[in-house]
Amino acid sequence: MSADFWCSSQRNKWQLSRQSLLEARRKVLLLERKMIQNGLIKDYPNIHYDFNMRIYLHNLLIKLGRRLNIRQVALATAEIYLNRFLTRVSLKEINVYLLVTTCLYVACKIEECPQHIRLIISEARNLWPEYIPHDVTKLAEFEFYLIEEMDSYLFLHHPYKSLIQIRDFLNENSAVFGFTLTDDELQNAWSLVNDSYITDLHLLLPPHIIAVASIYITIVLKKNLSAIRVNSSAVNSNGGPNSMMFNRNPDQNSMHIDDLMILANPSTPGSDLVNNLERTNFHDMKLDEETIKINKFMNFLDHSHINLDEVVEAMQDMINIYVQWNRYNEQGVKKALQVMLLNRQL
């Protein structure tokens, strides 16, 4: 394993451009059509690798991980494995419940918190008895399939480490930059990173960019939440993410999922912040404590030489999660998978 992201297989083999990712998915669709035409698989028009499916698979991983008390880093690794695998294989030719189980099984090995194969099969069967086989060799076979499709590149770098490094760096250099990350801010940023695994960001951008984007949302956009909340009553948040990662107390200093959705809504005042990072003039704001901290954070970004275009790109995708989550239809995805998987058993 490379201790340096820039020399790692994650950077050199599995960091894609948006164009190459689009091309990879186009190839999967072409392969899928050929397999349907040749009678190798059946066509299920309601099965798509869209945001509904991605959120559903994310929730499956979280659910199984909680039953096994898996560390967050292993869950994150499993989700990247899943995303990589689905750039090469169609959903219509696999059992997604077995895929989720296998990704978590392999991730636990790599992240040095291994789970016995019989235990993980047992817990998966408790959750999804109609889809997970008793035979542990099925998981072992899928493990080799998964590793082969990822070209055996399994070690990963995550934004969590970058978050901790930035927090520690700011603590050590507080006299220079004049601010530090509070525990609440770190937790909010950590939560944003957790949810970011639903997106393609971890196939597209370096981990430190995602970490900085999560801090930016937490520190800078928080300044505008009080004003935005005045208009937030018109936003319908039913069906939003059932995430334990966000503080839902009515604390004006806390980040809320509704706030992020409002920021992502182009019709909402203040929602153009993400698209105007470089043009934001914080000096025009009232110089209260939060604004001073924002100015100091922007000064830190200026000195960091971080690619701000990539930070903006990451922020847009991260905030968009919550817009998509608001439209999430779990029952539709669950029913479509049920029809596909149970028909295979007939």
Curated annotation (Swiss-Prot):
Cited SMART domains: CYCLIN
Where it mainly occurs, coarsely classed, is: nucleus
The UniProt entry, under Gene3D superfamilies, shows:
Cyclin-like (1.10.472.10)
**Which compartments is it annotated to reside in?**
Nucleus
* Keyword set, alphabetical order: Activator, Cyclin, Nucleus, Repressor, Transcription, Transcription regulation
Q: Return one Gene Ontology term, BP aspect.
A: positive regulation of transcription by galactose
The Cyclin N-terminal domain covers which part of the protein?
59-158
Q: What GO cellular component term, any one, is given?
A: CKM complex
A molecular function annotated in GO for this UniProt entry is: RNA polymerase II core promoter sequence-specific DNA binding
Q: Which InterPro entries match?
A: Cyclin-like_dom, Cyclin-like_sf, Cyclin/Ssn8, Cyclin_N
Q: Report if keyword Transcription is assigned.
A: yes
What the entry lists under Pfam families is as follows: Cyclin_N
Q: Oligomeric state and partners?
A: Component of the SRB8-11 complex, a regulatory module of the Mediator complex.
Q: Which family does it belong to?
A: Belongs to the cyclin family. Cyclin C subfamily.
Function noted in UniProt: Component of the SRB8-11 complex. The SRB8-11 complex is a regulatory module of the Mediator complex which is itself involved in regulation of basal and activated RNA polymerase II-dependent transcription. The SRB8-11 complex may be involved in the transcriptional repression of a subset of genes regulated by Mediator. It may inhibit the association of the Mediator complex with RNA polymerase II to form the holoenzyme complex. The SRB8-11 complex phosphorylates the C-terminal domain (CTD) of the largest subunit of RNA polymerase II.
Q: Protein name, please?
A: RNA polymerase II holoenzyme cyclin-like subunit
Q: Which organism is it from?
A: Scheffersomyces stipitis (strain ATCC 58785 / CBS 6054 / NBRC 10063 / NRRL Y-11545)
Q: What is the lineage of its organism?
A: Eukaryota, Fungi, Dikarya, Ascomycota, Saccharomycotina
